[in-house]
């Protein structure tokens, strides 16, 4: 999963991070940390996610990996990272050529080092299979065939095609109900149709027409919504001051 690279009014960054068990910071070996890095990393660190740092484009002639690593460390300190988060693993990579290594003198052949590090460093998802189905709606997804769909991570239980479910808002009020007409599970970047989804899966569901972002899609017996970051209301700020220009008149 990926987050927006900037602050917004919809709290989308926070909701996307709710689906994650770890975080990878991909930074340019020459340019270093960009302005958007600070906002997203602050949210990720605040949620207790442990980062993996990848220094990308290491084959650039103007790369400066040591300085960039120091910049990343200083940024994490400024953002309030704890000791465990500051002890982050580092990989050097070239996304264009498709390789990542722990040390620059290692053979540069594939991304196995990254995949192995994810398995070692990122904790397993904390899921409760035995509880009734509940999923937090994180994003809306439009499909020309399925219509209005909801994207989210299953927080507990399992759900099957044609199962009757309801949607409740953050106050626990029922806002929609219906039947799960389609289930798609993300496998990498692919969307795979499935008959059943379970806790820990990131999925797309179809069948509800009124449910929206931050609602809990759940079994009919569930009464309490999953915790979520609400959508901020539309905001406009205006500053009115005295015209102090020498040309005022």
Residue ranges and their predicted role:
Residues 1-249:
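Structural and coupling elements of P-loop NTPases
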């Amino acid at each position: 999963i990926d987050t927006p690279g900037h602050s917004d009014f919809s709290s989308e960054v926070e909701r996307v991070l709710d689906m994650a068990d770890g975080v990878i910071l991909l930074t340019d070996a020459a340019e270093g940390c960009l302005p958007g890095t600070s906002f997203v990393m602050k949210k990720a660190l605040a949620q207790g996610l442990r980062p993996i740092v990848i220094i990308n484009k290491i084959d650039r002639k103007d790369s400066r990996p040591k300085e960039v690593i120091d910049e990343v460390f200083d940024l994490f300190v400024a953002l309030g990272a704890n000791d465990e988060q500051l002890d982050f693993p580092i990989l050097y990579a070239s996304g264009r050529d498709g390789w990542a290594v722990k040390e620059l003198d290692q053979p540069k052949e594939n991304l196995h080092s990254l995949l192995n590090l994810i398995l070692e460093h990122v904790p397993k998802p904390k899921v409760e299979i035995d509880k009734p189905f509940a999923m937090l709606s994180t994003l809306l997804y439009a499909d020309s065939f399925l219509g209005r769909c909801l994207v989210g991570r299953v927080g507990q239980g399992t759900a099957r095609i044609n199962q009757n479910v309801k949607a409740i808002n953050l106050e626990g009020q029922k806002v929609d109900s219906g039947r799960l007409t389609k289930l798609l599970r993300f496998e990498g970047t692919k969307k795979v149709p499935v008959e059943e989804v379970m806790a820990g899966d990131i999925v797309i569901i179809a069948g509800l027409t009124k449910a929206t972002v931050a609602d809990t899609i759940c079994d009919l017996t569930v009464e309490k919504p999953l915790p979520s970051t609400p959508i901020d209301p539309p905001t406009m700020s205006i500053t009115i001051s005295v015209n102090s220009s020498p040309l005022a008149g």
